[in-house]
Amino acid sequence: MNSPLLDKSLDFSTQIVLFYEAFSKSKKDTTIAKQLLRSATSIGANINEAVYGNSKADFISKLHISFKETGESIYWLTLLKRTNLTGYDFESLLALTEEIKRMLIASLNTAKENKRTPYVSQFYKRITSFLYPIDIKNCHLENVTV
């Protein structure tokens, strides 16, 4: 399923995992890289969880966690860049993190503005299709309330 936000967060996580794998083979301390790995992979995981939230509040909460994780990831990327422990150019990763952060801000603003509307509203369908496009009408799952 195509979703710009999920696709970008998955691309970001993949790049971080590959960076960590290469960096961990060096004899340098990997503490900072491990912190980056945790925060970076948490972004996409929480975006995906938001799609399957039990309520709008849960949806907003998971997106907010993803937003906070982008801030933490930016911190660790900036620290790695400034210390030059790796010799890796982090500009593209920082730019991708900023792009994901902007997308999350837009999604959170829309979600918060429409928080008082019924759970399955036009807004919710629009946002979830942006995050993880599925056809809710043709989704036949037992014991699942949408």
State each model region's role.
Residues 1-45, 49-146:
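Short, C-terminally biased terminal segments at protein or domain edges
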